[in-house]
Amino acid sequence: MPSTKRYQHVIETPEPGEWELSGYEAAVPITEKSNPLTRNLDKADAEKIVQLLGQCDAEIFQEEGQIMPTYQRLYSESVLTTMLQVAGKVQEVLKEPDGGLVVLSGGGTSGRMAFLMSVSFNQLMKGLGQKPLYTYLIAGGDRSVVASRERTEDSALHGIEELKKVAAGKKRVVVIGISVGLSAPFVAGQMDYCMDNTAVFLPVLVGFNPVSMARNDPIEDWRSTFRQVAERMQKMQEKQEAFVLNPAIGPEGLSGSSRMKGGSATKILLETLLLAAHKTVDQGVVSSQRCLLEILRTFERAHQVTYSQSSKIATLTKQVGISLEKKGHVHLVGWQTLGIIAIMDGVECIHTFGADFRDIRGFLIGDHNDMFNQKDELSNQGPQFTFSQDDFLTSVLPSLTEIDTVVFIFTLDDNLAEVQALAERVREKSWNIQALVHSTVGQSLPAPLKKLFPSLISITWPLLFFDYEGSYVQKFQRELSTKWVLNTVSTGAHVLLGKILQNHMLDLRIANSKLFWRALAMLQRFSGQSKARCIESLLQVIHFPQPLSNDVRAAPISCHVQVAHEKEKVIPTALLSLLLRCSITEAKERLAAASSVCEVVRSALSGPGQKRSIQAFGDPVVP
């Protein structure tokens, strides 16, 4: 059968999948659907987990179906054309830098990606002797880069105020708002504000749902829903006064966990677009589609190179799982921007799995003084905001034990004497030290350093002969590869711990409105009960032990989130109460007595009176 693919790919990309069929979880946005590939993720061993998540990541590069093109994809003509148009707008700012600015903005993972990319492209410009033109905005400020503060993305006015501050006095500002599910009020407000002020601002919306699936419930402090904002942007795109970049990348391997594919696709799409703008700006030409495709293929190669190490990634997954099962801690110690990736992975486990901030933590080794907008925000804020080398040496190293795991993440271009000195100090406390090492063909890890690591994942990259801007491709590849490894390891470890039901994050922490609606959808999916009954049960658990009054029932979602984000096991408690028709107190007692959250829920699902299998439940209603 002849190939239906238009482009030559580095990796074997999947054919269109079951999730693209019109009737598959029809009421649910793509970014919240369950991925058919991983519907039995909770039953998989470490090797299978790595394989499945690798297949999900490959879906990022999948082309749209030729016979039944349901959704536009990363390689779709419409997406590539929009990428080129946005690259041209960025070039206009680069050519006339006085009064110009490129803002990358988002909440949670999207905001952390905005931070990482602004750091990278400012470094690129400094290396050329140019004035840096990038900045980032993250809901909740710099503290949200290194700690879990997802609730801050629920305010549109907060987003607008932050944008006004950084854009004051500027003449031309490209604002790239990132919201994986097209749902974050922080971004919606900024996009609307930009459209009201097109003399200065050009808004670019990046997400991975069709606009018809953007969130449409009211934003508490804004006049429009996210969908209305996105629809307005689509109309203004006809005059190139706004742009929407929203290719479908398929559901997450772990349902709704946008830190994974959503974060990776954000990085791939925007680094491709921005790097193409920089590579061609001095040539006086607009970026070409060929330039975009060349860069996209290097990211495909990163997938190929990374997942060629699947067996070693699985070994690390098992080791991290053992540490967490024994109530130990996992410390991810990364050099330069790989340290940012490590911090992101640790922080995102908190709300994703209901983890403690000490369970998996990232640390950045290297100078970070020029990275943050307001570094003072991070001083003396408490242990959950610590992330530097000094923090690791003073607060972690003295208390390391044999049940902890330390993972060193570095390249052979880093200061290897510094790596060795720190590794030797860690080895004095614990033998459980691992490494993720990036090298280029021809480089080798010095023997004295190699022997310090009982187990290591060594990823060797081919030599690339690029100009200066192009040399950043390898830096971006290594960051993406590190992200894929760490996301897979931390997700896999929590799967092995019994935190996942099928491919759903049953024990997530309800930290913002998006997660509130996701919690409700899970209750509907697994209980088979009405939306009204599930809301009632969810609110009862959130506000327990206080009885629900009509005033509480009628309160805005933000009020419920404010209470819920401090509580543990909200969703499993509500689900048990629904399935067993028992009190909240009894549900809590059953969970407390169980060795695994998901085991007690599985038992309830298969018990008397549960007539339908999990698969039989209909689609939940998502606003």
UniProtKB/Swiss-Prot annotation:
Residue ranges constituting the SIS domain according to the UniProt record: 90-286, 320-476
Gene3D superfamilies (alphabetical): 1.10.8.1080, 3.40.50.12620, Glucose-6-phosphate isomerase like protein, domain 1 (3.40.50.10490)
Annotated binding of beta-D-fructose 1-phosphate, by residue: T109, S110, E153, S179, V180, G181, E348
Keyword Cytoplasm recorded: yes
Annotated knockout phenotype: Mice appear normal and are fertile. Their body weights do not differ significantly from the body weights of wild-type animals up to 60 weeks of age. Mice however show a substantial decrease in hepatic glucokinase (Gck) expression and enzymatic activity, with no change in basal blood glucose levels. However, following a glucose tolerance test, mice show impaired glucose clearance, possibly because they cannot recruit sufficient glucokinase due to the absence of a nuclear reserve.
CC per GO annotation: cytoplasm; cytosol; mitochondrion; nucleoplasm; nucleus
Binding-site residues for beta-D-fructose 6-phosphate, renumbered to this chain: T109, S110, S179, V180, G181
Domain notes: Fructose 1-phosphate and fructose 6-phosphate compete for the same binding site.
Region Essential for interaction with GCK, annotated ranges: 463-465
Keywords, alphabetical: Carbohydrate metabolism, Cytoplasm, Mitochondrion, Nucleus, Repeat
Family named by the database record: Belongs to the GCKR family.
PANTHER family: GLUCOKINASE REGULATORY PROTEIN
Subunit structure and binding partners: Interacts (fructose 6-phosphate bound form) with GCK.
GO BP terms: carbohydrate derivative metabolic process; intracellular glucose homeostasis; negative regulation of glucokinase activity; protein import into nucleus; protein localization to nucleus; response to fructose; response to glucose
Keyword hit for Nucleotide-binding: no
Protein name as it appears in the record: Glucokinase regulatory protein
Classification via PROSITE patterns: GCKR, SIS
Important for interaction with GCK, as annotated region: 199-200
Intracellular or extracellular location(s): Cytoplasm; Nucleus; Mitochondrion
Pfam families tied to this protein: GKRP-like_C, GKRP_SIS_2, GKRP_SIS_N
